[in-house]
C-alpha cells in the first residue's frame, strides 16, 4: 500500500468524523510536543512519521534517525503545530513509532544473537494484513533482510504444493520455462532425503524446515560436496537461544517469522511543552 494512502487510512481510523475535543476547544494555539522513550530500543518509523506530520501541517523540529538506539527518557522527536492537530495525530504517530520500533528492536536482538556476518537473517510473509510493507521496512531498520514480499517474488514450493507434484525434476523444468528469467525456485524440505531430492531436481534454494541443528548440518555438508551453488535456508521455530547454533550449521540464511509476529510495542509517550 502506498505510504500516503496507508497514513490517511490510519488517521481516519482514529479520527472518525472528527475529534470531539476540537468542538469544545475555545481557541486554538501553537504548541510544542515531545515524543519520548519509556524503554530502550532501536528507532524505526521515521519515514512514516515525517510523512504523517507533513500531511497534517505539523513541523518536525528534530528527530532521531531510523536504526538509532535510544534509552528511557530520550527525546525521539520534537514537533510543533496547532494544539488541536497535535492531539489529533498523537495516537496514530505513537502507534506507528511504537510498532515499527518494536519490530526493529526485536530484530536487532536476533542479529546480535546470530553473531555472524556470513549468514543472513530474513523475515517471512507472516505479517499483519495490509501492513506487510510497513513491517518489513521495520525489519530492515533492525538490521535483517527481507524474504519474499509476495507470491510474485519467487516460486516457493511447500508441502501443500508438493503433494500434487508427481515428478519434481520434470515440474521444475516446466516451471523454468514459464517463470521470469530472474525468478528463483525454493523448495521447503522436512528431511535429509527431501533436501537431497530438491537439489537433484534443480532447486535454487533449499529450505530446511523445522529440522534440528544436526540434521541441518548434514544437509549443508551434502550440499557443499555435491551442489555448492545451491543456497540453504534454515527456518521453523528458531529462537534467540538457538539461532547461533543454526548459524554455525552451514546455511546461508535463517528466516524467522517471530521478528514480526512476536514483536511488542516499544513504550513511548508524547508530552506537551
How does the language model describe each region?
Residues 1-190, 194-201, 205, 217-218, ...:
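Acidic/glycine-rich phosphate/pyrophosphate-binding loops and surrounding catalytic core
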Residues 210, 236, 258:
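Short secondary-structure boundary segments
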Residues 223:
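Conserved hydrophobic residues forming the short capping helix/wall of the S-adenosyl-L-methionine
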Residues 234-235, 240:
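Structured functional modules or segments
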Residues 269-273:
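Active-site loop ensemble at the mouth of alpha/beta enzyme cores that anchors a bound cofactor
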Amino acid at each position: 500500500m502506498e505510504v500516503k494512502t496507508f497514513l490517511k487510512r490510519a488517521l481516519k481510523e482514529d479520527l472518525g468524523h472528527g475529534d470531539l475535543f476540537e468542538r469544545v476547544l475555545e481557541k486554538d494555539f501553537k504548541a510544542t510536543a515531545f515524543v519520548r522513550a519509556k524503554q530502550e530500543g532501536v528507532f524505526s518509523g521515521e519515514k512514516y512519521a515525517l510523512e504523517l506530520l507533513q500531511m497534517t501541517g505539523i513541523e518536525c523540529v528534530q528527530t532521531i534517525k531510523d536504526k538509532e538506539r535510544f534509552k528511557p527518557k530520550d527525546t525521539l522527536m520534537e514537533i510543533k503545530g496547532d494544539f488541536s492537530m497535535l492531539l489529533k495525530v498523537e495516537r496514530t504517530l505513537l502507534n506507528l513509532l511504537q510498532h515499527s520500533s518494536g519490530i526493529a528492536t526485536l530484530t536487532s536482538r536476533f542479529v546480535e544473537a546470530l553473531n555472524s556476518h556470513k549468514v543472513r537473517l530474513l523475515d517471512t510473509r507472516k505479517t499483519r494484513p495490509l501492513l506487510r510493507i510497513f513491517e518489513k521496512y521495520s525489519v530492515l531498520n533492525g538490521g535483517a533482510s527481507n524474504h519474499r514480499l509476495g507470491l510474485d517474488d519467487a516460486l516457493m514450493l511447500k508441502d501443500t504444493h508438493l503433494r500434487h507434484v508427481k515428478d519434481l525434476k520434470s515440474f521444475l523444468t516446466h516451471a523454468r520455462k514459464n517463470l521470469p528469467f530472474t525468478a528463483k525456485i525454493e523448495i521447503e524440505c522436512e528431511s535429509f532425503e527431501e533436501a537431497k531430492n530438491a537439489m537433484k531436481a534443480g532447486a535454487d534454494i533449499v529450505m530446511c524446515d523445522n529440522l534440528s541443528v544436526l540434521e541441518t548440518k548434514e544437509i549443508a555438508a551434502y550440499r557443499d560436496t555435491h551442489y555448492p551453488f545451491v543456497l540453504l535456508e534454515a527456518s521453523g521455530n528458531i529462537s534467540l537461544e538457538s539461532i547461533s547454533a543454526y548459524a554455525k550449521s552451514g546455511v546461508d540464511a535463517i528466516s524467522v517469522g517471530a521478528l514480526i509476529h512476536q514483536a511488542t510495542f516499544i513504550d513511548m509517550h508524547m508530552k506537551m511543552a
